[in-house]
């Protein structure tokens, strides 16, 4: 008999979590204006808000933390981090930042100007925010099949080459670069194939445009290439990473995901022009060039985390837990973006809460219902996150409306996933009775989902 799968690590430290009553949760959520971002962590039983900075570090990372060099300039921790990044990506020029959105802010301050158009595959919230706040346009060129949540397609994160070429033909002088998000978070944590990365590079070369990767989950993307794309089964994750980054000119990185740390990020590039152009913004916004807003100890932990998370066993353990939750949802017939993504399950709220109109935000309503059911915090990746059109100020209802359940790395067991699955089943079983959603009572002009205030409709 074949041995069953088991995690590639063992647990060394634990943290207690506590259940609450539905009555308590109703009061807490009302006080939070039905925005789960406004809940304090002690009011959450299983926290699937994000996998960003919420994972558990290894003993090797903790030991690296203690060896951090806190020198203001030229710290050995930075040199080790730089060496590790270059080994994995092939990029020689590195600017550390305190997290991913800071990397975008620094680099986009140099690259993006008013009137620009930045095509890519489903820019995530901060990426789109940094583009639109500079009065530029984030143009989504994701493949159409990504919108069909029930279609089984291995690389739903891909760029639609025809859409991209049309954008390049029509707006050549307005495009500073092409951006590819790996994996494609907004489309459901879906990967981009190596063949697609290669095609984008060829098109970029044809139109003489640089390519930037939003690389928060690059290692998960490499895992999917290994297990799903022909010709890569016998390659190591590190070999696949080097080939992926061969098709880019640079990357921004939130190290809080595939770097396995609680804080940190960086810019890496092969273009000296980008490095020189972004340097002054790094110093102005983040800090000196060899720490960029990160403590030396965090850079040391990040270097160790990047090494760990570009090994197959670590990624296999992580992604199989996501797949486990997906299989439980399949047992109950609950629709989600298929196949399961690398870091999260994305529930298709429009297919679950069929009686809640788009104008009442079904995915946010589902987020509310799941928290009330079991104290589980997910996050809406849908119509609220999409923000209003910067020109017309109308809500954007054209994309998917999803509830994301992002699973922190090395934190929860499959028993926790069973609780999540049954809680969702309970909500799913009463879906016909959920006919009203929520309305916005206050919102910020941009990236409103973090602070929006809502009212529950009866």
From Swiss-Prot:
PROSITE patterns per the UniProt record, alphabetical: BETA_ELIM_LYASE
Essential cofactor(s): pyridoxal 5'-phosphate
Pfam families, per the entry: Beta_elim_lyase
Residues with N6-(pyridoxal phosphate)lysine modification: 257
Transmembrane segments: none
Alphabetically ordered keywords of this record: Lyase, Pyridoxal phosphate
GO molecular function, one term: carbon-carbon lyase activity
EC code: 4.1.99.-
Keyword Lyase: yes
Cited InterPro entries: ArAA_b-elim_lyase/Thr_aldolase, Beta-eliminating_lyase, PyrdxlP-dep_Trfase, PyrdxlP-dep_Trfase_major, PyrdxlP-dep_Trfase_small, Tryptophanase_CS
GO biological process: aromatic amino acid metabolic process
Protein family per UniProt: Belongs to the beta-eliminating lyase family.
Name under which the protein is recorded: Probable beta-eliminating lyase
Organism per entry: Trichomonas vaginalis (strain ATCC PRA-98 / G3)
Organism ancestry: Eukaryota, Metamonada, Parabasalia, Trichomonadida, Trichomonadidae
